[in-house]
Amino acid sequence: FRVEHGDVGGVSIDKHGTPLLPSVRDSAASADAVLFGGVGGPKWDTPDASVRPEDALLQLRSHLGVFANIRPVKVYPWLADSSALKPSVLEGVDLVVVRELTGGLYYAQPKGRTETPQGWSAVDTMRYSEAEVERILRVGFRLAQSRQGKLASVDKANVLECSRLW
């Protein structure tokens, strides 16, 4: 068992001037597993930054082909009273959220901020290919088959063309 450490995000920006060194990216790619911590913090949380800590995470996701975020929802009985929902609603919750990580708003161009006579303006572009949608849906379907057999796609198909593709 061998553990390697690499600087990513804000720490890497401070030390190396970039959120992710190619050597760290390559080390992650050749590893059997990657344990990843946070990339940023208040020090690097400035909207005007040209180099951002989270770019490390986006680069790693893309390079490693990590496209599915799988988040099970677990309700701990001793915390149920702390929820905004009634404990009776939380009983028996069996939910897993599957989120696509490498398409859409994170990667599509154009994106950016510009100053106009009326103030600042920002744009993010949402773009998905049919292959990206199919890939994440297959993850969701496989997961649903191994559980209760139910899958819900949460979108905004009444107004977003990208959602209609789903």
Feature annotation, model-predicted:
Residues 2, 34, 150:
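Residue-level detector of anion-binding/catalytic polar loops
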Residues 2-11:
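A short beta-strand-loop structural module common to alpha/beta enzyme folds
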Residues 8, 39, 75, 156-157:
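Short, ordered loop/turn segments at secondary-structure junctions
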Residues 11, 42-43, 159-161:
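Short, active-site-adjacent cap segments at secondary-structure transitions
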Residues 11-16, 129-130:
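Short, flexible loop segments at the rims of nucleotide/cofactor-binding pockets, characterized by
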